[in-house]
Amino acid sequence: VEDILRIYGYNNVEIPTTLKSSLTTKGEVDYSQKLQNLISEQLVGCGFNEILNNSLTRAGYYDGMETYPSKNLVMLLNPLSTDLNAMRQTLLFGGLESISHNANRKNADLKFFEFGNCYYFDAEKKNPEKSLAAYTENYHLGLWVTGKKVSNSWAHADEESSVYELKAYVENIFLRLGLNMRNLVVGNLVDDIYATALSVQTKGGKRLATFGIVTVSYTHLRAHETRH
């Protein structure tokens, strides 16, 4: 526009006697983005690296899963390959792919985080009048910690990462968002994804977070699939 005005001539443009403007206010999207930036800055300050994985994933990852049954996958009608034939239900496998990619290149001490949408299909909610009634999209944050917490330091002995370290990161996120852990309920979680795990819920029963040690069957599955 500036180049056009230069050619046309600023003096040839009539300026009205009144100027019109509209006031804008911050909406829900702006507030959500602000919170995301706040959490991202905190995690980066703790040594995390942000990752961004494809929302398309391999449906085979969900075979036999109880937490995320394959029947609830949003399947693609014409997938390019079996590696990208469904929409992800969880951020878990994308993070494991990133870990496997780095571990295969001798980089095993990792701390990752990712913000992303997950997708869910419920056949019971199908409605001929509402084509999208059976589909749900939710925004999630995933954290992955693996390898050594401290390595090759002259001031500190090598120390392996642990679930307690991850628990501290999760609690610090809640504190940064103004949530008092005393008002939340932390309890044991039985889940086929984790060998041992905890969940964080409100007193009303709404689950806010789950974290734990991923079972060997899923970590081995990811490594095997990556090699092939």
Located regions from the model:
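A short, hydrophobic C-terminal helix/tail in secreted or cell-surface proteins
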Residues: 223-228
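Extended beta-strand-rich architecture
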Residues: 2-222
